[in-house]
Amino acid sequence: MACTAKPACTAKPGRSPRSQPTRVQSLPKQVRKGGVDVLAAVPLSEETEFKVELFVKPVIGNAEGTTPHYWSISSPLKTAEAANVTPDADTTVCYSLSQVAPPDIPNQVSECDMLIWELYRMETEVLVLPVLNAGILTTGGVGGIAGPQLYFWAVGGQPLDVLGLAPTEKYKGPAQYTVNPKTNGTVPHVYSSSETPRARVTNEKYSIESWVADPSRNDNCRYFGRMVGGAATPPVVSFSNNSTIPLLDENGIGILCLQGRLYITCADLLGVNKNRVHTGLSRFFRLHFRQRRVRNPYTINLLYKQVFNKPADDISGQLQVTEVTMTEETGPLPPTVEGNVGVPTTSNLSHLPATVTLQATGPILNTQG
C-alpha cells in the first residue's frame, strides 16, 4: 500500500490556530563575588540566622599619643592652621572602625561547597543631642552647631578600601597620629589610577579630610555617605528607628563574611560650633546575618598539601644525603670493595639495578679514631 502524505492541518473558520509554546533557552549563570562562586542561600531558622547590635564611638586624633580620643567635641581650632596647612590632630575627625565575628558554623566545609555568614540587612542611626549649653561652656557664645556635615557608614567582608586625596597642593594633614597619603605635592586630586595613594582602613588613624571610599573597589562592601556644606548652613539632623537598609545587590547577594569577620567603618560630623568640631555621640548598628552556600575554592589536594602534608617542625640536619631506590629487595653495594667477598667485585657491581643512585661525590663518613 502506497504511503500517502497527511493533509496539512487547517484552522476551522472563526477559530485562530493553536499557538505553539515559546521555548526559552535557560543559560547557566555563574555569580562571583569576593572571589568565590556564590550558590543558594540557606532557609532562615533559629540555627541559620544571627543578629548583633553594637555602638561605635566617634574618633578624634591625638596630638600627644598613639591612642585615639573618643570625643564628640574636638580641641579648639587654631587660626594659624591656614598658613601652616598642618592642622592639629586633636581637631581632626577620623574614621571609626569595628569588627564583628559571627559564631562558628558546624559542619561548615564539604568537598563541593562551604557555608558562610552573609549580612543581608541592617538598621543604623546616629545618636545626637541639641548643643546649647555645651556651646556656651566651650566657646563662650550662644547658639547651636553650624557649618559642614558628614554622615558616612560602610560594612564589608574586608576593611574599607580608600583613596588618598589632598584638598590643596600644600595640605599635608596632621603631623602626629594620623596616616597621611603620600602624594607628589603638586596635584590635589586624583591624577592617575595607578599612582593615586590607596589603602585599607585597618586602624582608626585615617582622617576624613584625606581619605575617601574607593568606588572602583569595595566589591564585597556597601557604603553610604551624605555631605551638607556651607559655612553657616543650619544643620538638619533627623533620626529614628523605623528604617531598614537592605544590603542585597542585583543578584540578591549581600555582604559575604569570607574571612569570618564583618568590618564596620563610620564617621559622623555634625558641624562646627564657633571654633570646635562636633561629631555624633555614637552610631548604632543592628546587623542581621544569614547563612549562604558558596563553592568550595579549596580542593582536597590543596588542603592536604597545606594542612596535613606540612612538616610540624623545622630542623637543621646534615646535607649531601642521596636518595637510594631499592628494586626487588636488592640493596646497593659500595662503589669500591676492599678484599675478597666471595665473588669478584666487578661481578657484584654488574648486578646493581639501573634505578640505584649511589652517592658519587662527598660521601658522609662516620670516622672514629
Curated annotation (Swiss-Prot):
CC annotations in GO: host cell nucleus; T=7 icosahedral viral capsid
Keyword Cell cycle carried by entry: no
GO molecular function (one): structural molecule activity
Region (Disordered): 1-28
Keyword presence, Repressor: no
Alphabetical list of SUPFAM superfamilies matching this protein: Group I dsDNA viruses (SSF88648)
Subcellular localization(s) per the UniProt record: Virion; Host nucleus
InterPro entries assigned to the protein according to its UniProt record, in alphabetical order: Capsid_VP1_Polyomavir (IPR000662), dsDNA_vir_gr_I_capsid (IPR011222), Polyomavir_VP1_sf (IPR036931)
GO biological process: endocytosis involved in viral entry into host cell; virion attachment to host cell
Disulfide partners: none
Biased composition (Polar residues): 17-28
Keywords: Capsid protein, Disulfide bond, Host nucleus, Host-virus interaction, Late protein, T=7 icosahedral capsid protein, Viral attachment to host cell, Viral penetration into host cytoplasm, Virion, Virus endocytosis by host, Virus entry into host cell
General function of this protein: Forms an icosahedral capsid with a T=7 symmetry and a 40 nm diameter. The capsid is composed of 72 pentamers linked to each other by disulfide bonds and associated with VP2 or VP3 proteins. Interacts with sialic acids on the cell surface to provide virion attachment to target cell. Once attached, the virion is internalized by endocytosis and traffics to the endoplasmic reticulum. Inside the endoplasmic reticulum, the protein folding machinery isomerizes VP1 interpentamer disulfide bonds, thereby triggering initial uncoating.
Assembly information from the UniProt record: Homomultimer. The virus capsid is composed of 72 icosahedral units, each one composed of five disulfide-linked copies of VP1. Interacts with minor capsid proteins VP2 and VP3.
Family: Belongs to the polyomaviruses coat protein VP1 family.
Protein's name according to its UniProt entry: Major capsid protein VP1
